[in-house]
Amino acid sequence: MTTTKNNGHKKLNVPNKREQNQTCLDSAEREGLRPKGNVPNLRFPEFQGEWEELGLSELLDFKNGLNPKPNKFGKGIKFISVMDILNNAVITYDCIKASVDVTEKELADFSVEKGDILFQRSSETLEDVGRANVYIDDKTAVFGGFVIRGKKKGEYDPQYFNYLLRSPFARKRIIPMGAGAQHFNIGQEGLSKVKLHFANIEEQKKIGKMLSLLDERMATQNKIIDKLQSLIKGIAQHCIRELINGWEYVRLGDICKITTGKLDANAQVENGQYPFFTCAERPFNIDSYAFDTEALLISGNGANLGYINYYKGKFNAYQRTYVLDHFSVNIQYVKWALKVLLPQRIAIEKSSSNTPYIVLSTLADLKIPIPNNSKQNHIADLMMSFERKLSTQLALSDLYNKQKQYLLRQMFI
């Protein structure tokens, strides 16, 4: 999408990054710089020659999964479900959640072995139909009825095949095979019609190894983020609970102004100029602002009930998002006090009145300990330093993900 920008009295059409990349590729192809034929844009230099187009049925034998009775679950051999396909970079025996008791015949008919590919049969959205994953463990598992197994019969590198099936090129060929139903489904016949391009086995191994190493680094990064978030939560709880005895408690409504936004949740604009805070964790965009202040934004309902954002500047807000501003104490200290104390208050009100949203009195009457200014500033500075560290780690995780998506676009055809 091209963005129009004002430059004095002239309007300049500035192409976005995707358009710029495509322009570069088109230009390179015209000048003979882009590889021609069945080869990817990005390739290890030691490999040459075109890739071979093969049907999935030339490499895999397809079969629908097992539908055990409910009393068979909870013991026995590991049982691969759709969630195991979606929630893991690769499937190993230990990462499979469910177990099932099967007969010897069922084990023979529905076994999953190293190198087999598992496909999601049904999805509520067309974009997710036919999602796939590879089983890379030496231990035998079985698979469920909402899964299609591709039993390995041809030569391929399992890791390469896994990443190929996640590439935009493969998704464009698989998705149409699941169209045309209320719940989008793909069957063995549809998968058998899909044709994809395969490198020679040595090139497959190198591509699969490189991308698997990137996935390992991304998994490590996620662990770093999880540990850091846990540390931050623990330190915040320690700091606030340390203040419970010996300091004055005040009503939140007495140290700030509490209002809400006025807009519907669907008021966002794709390329709007200002942040638009709803009950989602991240703000959307909008073309108009109703607030120009330093504030805490608290989600008043939905899945992220009680989620707290901080913002300083011009913004707008959803009618069920609470806007807290004009603080008489350190706003950053209050933010962390609320992160500790508000979930407890919400849990109490949910259990007593089953209220799935925050009412004004929930916030206004919430009492929080207020230490002296020096203590407030110390806690605020400490927690902000951890937030900066977390932001750095989250940005690095986002960078790894963008790098992976780029490689999936450029290293496959």
Where do the protein language model's features map onto the residues?
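Amphipathic alpha-helical coiled-coil/heptad-repeat segments
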Residues: 1-55, 198-251, 367-413
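A short glycine-rich beta-alpha junction/loop motif
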Residues: 36, 67-70, 140-146, 178-202, ...
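Non-catalytic DNA-recognition/assembly elements of restriction-modification systems
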Residues: 41-66, 193, 242-263, 267-278
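Short glycine/proline-enriched turns and hinge-like loops at secondary-structure junctions
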Residues: 72-73, 91-93, 270, 288-291
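Short beta-strand/loop turn elements enriched in aromatics
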Residues: 73-91
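A short beta-sheet element
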Residues: 81-83, 96-166, 278-343, 349-363
